[in-house]
UniProtKB/Swiss-Prot annotation:
CDD domains: RHOD_YceA (cd01518)
Family of this protein: Belongs to the TrhO family.
EC number: 1.14.-.-
Gene Ontology biological process terms, A to Z: tRNA modification
Gene: trhO
Species whose genome carries this gene: Pseudomonas putida (strain ATCC 700007 / DSM 6899 / JCM 31910 / BCRC 17059 / LMG 24140 / F1)
Biological function: Catalyzes oxygen-dependent 5-hydroxyuridine (ho5U) modification at position 34 in tRNAs.
Name used for this protein in its record: tRNA uridine(34) hydroxylase
EC category: oxidoreductase
Protein's UniProt keywords contain Cell inner membrane: no
Length: 310
């Protein structure tokens, strides 16, 4: 790869009794290796996306894997020319991905992991119910052929969607997927608790599928939304053509950018008629700051605010 920046999405569900104490040494390791991005720590594990040089990412991964609990931390890599993150953060959370249902613990019960090479065969089975566990704006960018879109705005809405639409006695086989594997892994734990018997989820998520399955064999249609400045990636993990509205965070394509309702950093066709005047003024001021920083060839810290896969 000629591109200088490595982007690593990583997570692991593992009991971290000392997650509060881990924050400072983890942050120091990221800073020492000049790694940017955000990692989330909770009692149930670690999650996040970071970026840096090859040496920097390797240094962080080596530090993490020196802890026996994180020796097999799941991570996927892609590459880009510029830093997709401006800040370095480690946040303490109740959950590393927020489902909001007490007692759901992938460390105790989880569905069957399916390797990317075996995914096509599974989802081609007509008896398998294929569910995209991501949010509506992500699904709109791309999904697996034949997948059901729950049309949820946040992962918190997923449990109610399942309760309202599916019956464990009728839906015997369920397969789920998400960007990096974390949401569908937690969703599988929830589904088992609800009585669904055969629950499968894509190991490593869409990004691992892109990495390991040749494009000519792919059952994916479209791009994949990612939680950094690239906005989307294609099947070859190169940066997609989408931008992102800084007002509503919705991905926008070339046609939407040509709309009369699109104003860079201020509004887009998805939000122009719903923004309050206060929000609009704030967005205009922020965009001026971003453009000023760009003119001075400086990164702007509010050009993108990291949001964990959720």
């Amino acid at each position: 790869m000629s591109q200088a920046i490595v982007v690593a999405a990583l997570y692991k569900f593992v009991t971290l009794e000392d997650y509060v104490e881990l924050r400072e040494p983890l942050l120091k390791t990221m800073l020492d290796n000049n790694v940017k991005g955000t990692l989330l720590l909770a009692h149930e594990g670690i999650n996040g996306t970071v970026s840096g040089t090859r040496e920097g990412i390797d240094g962080l991964l080596a530090w993490l894997r020196n802890d026996p609990r994180l020796v097999d931390v799941d991570h996927k890599e892609s590459y880009c020319d510029e830093q997709p993150f401006y800040r370095t953060k480690v946040k303490l959370k109740k959950e590393i991905v927020t489902l909001g249902v007490p007692g759901v613990d992938p460390n105790q019960a989880v569905g069957t992991y399916v390797e990317p090479k075996d995914w096509n065969a599974l989802i081609s089975d007509p008896e398998v119910l294929l569910i995209d566990t991501r949010n509506d704006y992500e699904v709109a960018i791309g999904t697996f052929k034949g997948a059901i879109d729950p049309k949820t705005e946040t992962f918190r809405e997923f449990p109610e969607y399942i309760k309202a639409n599916f019956d464990p006695s009728k839906h015997k086989k369920v397969a789920m997927f998400c960007t990096g594997g974390i949401r569908c892994e937690k969703a599988s734990s929830y589904m088992l608790g609800e009585g669904f018997e055969s629950v499968y989820h894509l190991k490593g998520g869409i990004l691992k599928y892109f990495e390991e399955v040749p494009q000519e064999e792919s059952l994916w249609d479209g791009d994949c939304f990612v939680f950094d400045n690239r906005v989307t990636v294609r099947h070859d993990l190169s940066e997609g053509e989408y931008d992102q509205c800084h007002a509503c965070r919705h991905p926008i394509n070339a046609e939407e950018r040509a709309s009369e309702h699109y104003s860079p950093g201020v509004s887009c066709p998805h939000c122009w008629d719903s923004l309050s005047e206060k929000t609009r003024r704030s967005a205009i001021d922020r965009q001026k700051q971003i453009e000023l920083a760009k003119a001075r060839n400086l990164p702007h810290p509010i050009g993108y605010n990291y949001k964990a896969e959720a």
